[in-house]
Amino acid sequence: MGTIADDILDDLHGRILKTLDQLRTELAAVRTGRASLHLLDNVRVDYYGTPTPLNQVATLSVPEARLIVVKPWEKSMIPPIEKAIRDGNLGLNPMSDKDLVRVPIPALTEERRKEIVKQVKHKGEEHKIAVRNVRREAKELIEVAEKDGDISGDDAEKALEKMQKETDDGVKKIDEIVAAKEKDVLQV
């Protein structure tokens, strides 16, 4: 196959992997009823007037299955950390305890678990669409290269077959990631 087709396929592969990584990152922040440091990934603390990621002003740990402990590097950061976690729309109620903040993770109701599963499936669908859009763009590039005479018809056909397999594998992997997260959310 021509190098143009190889370059297009390499780009497709890289963009699909990036989409899978993005899905994993987004789903890591979804609450499952068990403590996970990723729950607080999007929490920003007012650090001397600058919104700063929580993990840049404190040490985070999970000593128990339903508890996150936040140990700020400066004691003065305890109230802003509590406020940031409370305001983070995570349904969490942090409590200060001398020089640290305890964040108990409440159990999820069955109804809430089902809502979360819907969100997880929706995120999976969004990422499947992204993978298909990447395939469509790559297909258009292959067709243009064939029309311009940069690659032969046979090479274009082989590239399109590889592209479809790559896309199918990406969609299958998204289904696996979503199924694993669903199982995690529904587990009591």
Swiss-Prot record:
Gene3D superfamilies: 3.30.1360.40, Ribosome-recycling factor. SUPFAM superfamilies: Ribosome recycling factor, RRF (SSF55194). It comes from Anaeromyxobacter dehalogenans (strain 2CP-1 / ATCC BAA-258). The keyword Protein biosynthesis applies. GO terms for cellular component: cytosol. This is Ribosome-recycling factor. Responsible for the release of ribosomes from messenger RNA at the termination of protein biosynthesis. May increase the efficiency of translation by recycling ribosomes from one round of translation to another. PANTHER family: MITOCHONDRIAL RIBOSOME RECYCLING FACTOR PSEUDO 1 (PTHR20982:SF3), RIBOSOME RECYCLING FACTOR (PTHR20982). It holds the Pfam family RRF.
